[in-house]
């Protein structure tokens, strides 16, 4: 087999493996976001894109974003 062809095949395989590993890593980091009026852990917790985690006294809930 042509050595240049082997190098190209090797690079394609390596690129595919790296892309697959990155996709798995991103999936493992992703978590389900809370929805409107659902409890959340703190100001940084994940709510859906139109909401944010807001303190309502002693607890936090996902509420509609305020302002711009």
UniProtKB/Swiss-Prot annotation:
An annotated Gene Ontology molecular function: calcium channel regulator activity
Family per record: Belongs to the scorpion calcin-like family.
Any Gene Ontology CC annotation: extracellular region
Transmembrane segments: none
Tissue: Expressed by the venom gland. In intravenously injected mice, the labeled toxin has preference for heart, liver and lungs.
Protein name stated in the entry: Intracellular calcium channel modulator CCP-Ts
Biotech / industrial applications: The peptide(14-39) may have biotechnological applications as a drug delivery system targeting cancer cells, since it lacks pharmacological activity of the wild-type toxin and has selective internalization properties in specific cell lines. It is directed to the nucleus of six neoplastic cell lines (SK-MEL-188, HEP G2, Caco-2, MDA-MB-231, A549 and DU 145), as well as in rat cardiomyocytes, and rat heptocytes. However, it is unable to cross the cell membrane of six normal immortalized cell lines (HUV-EC-C, HFF-1, MCR-5, HEK-293, BHK-21 and MDCK).
Subcellular location: Secreted; Nucleus
Signal peptide from the UniProt entry: 1-23
Coiled coil regions, renumbered to chain: none
Keywords per UniProt: Calcium channel impairing toxin, Cardiotoxin, Disulfide bond, Ion channel impairing toxin, Knottin, Nucleus, Secreted, Signal, Toxin
Described purpose of this protein according to its UniProt entry: Cell penetrating peptide (CPP) that increases intracellular calcium release through the activation of nuclear inositol 1,4,5-trisphosphate receptors (ITPR) of cardiomyocytes, thereby causing an increase in the contraction frequency of these cells. In vivo, this toxin is not lethal to mice, hovewer anti-CPP serum reduces venom lethality, suggesting that this toxin is lethal when it acts in synergy with other venom components.
